[in-house]
Amino acid sequence: IVVYTSDQGFYLGEHGWFDKRFIYNESFKTPLMIKWPNVINAGTTNKEMVQNLDFAQTFLEAAMIDIPNDMQGESLIPLLKGNSDEWTRDAVYYHYYEYPSVHMAKRHYGIVNKEFKLVHFYYDIDEWELYDRLNDPNEANNVYNNPDYKDVVEKLTQELKEMRIKYKDSEELDKSFIY
């Protein structure tokens, strides 16, 4: 198996930022290419939502090693074998909490699916953002307070709460580890 991936990209002024720690697309998306002869057909592409949390489970399964129950990712093996119908993830969770720090990126967490991105900035502020990824791929127009998106906000807020529980993430945890 040959895997090519990278760290996320830097902002070069997009969204008024330099650096890389925000949930916006410029630093949220990372490249991932895998070559696995006799398993992955050459030229195959996939648009499913995967994340670096999935790499360890994937490599363990490929090596036929038991996957510990406390790992948070999901093996990419079904996707690599072309079995997208076995893939159940339709959204990913993100949390950045190292503020204040040299980077000065505000603490925030969010949920991202193929259509929308919901973000909550917290700690010394309480701001929400919602982006319609299909109609606003540059994430330039925050539609969180737009009444047309009320149902989307409610649905994603509930899914975000569920993901925070799934990953055992909370403000209480922040208070324990972040000063």
Locate each region found by the language model:
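Short acidic-hydrophobic sequence patches enriched in Asp/Glu that either
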Residues: 24-28, 48-51, 68, 72, ...
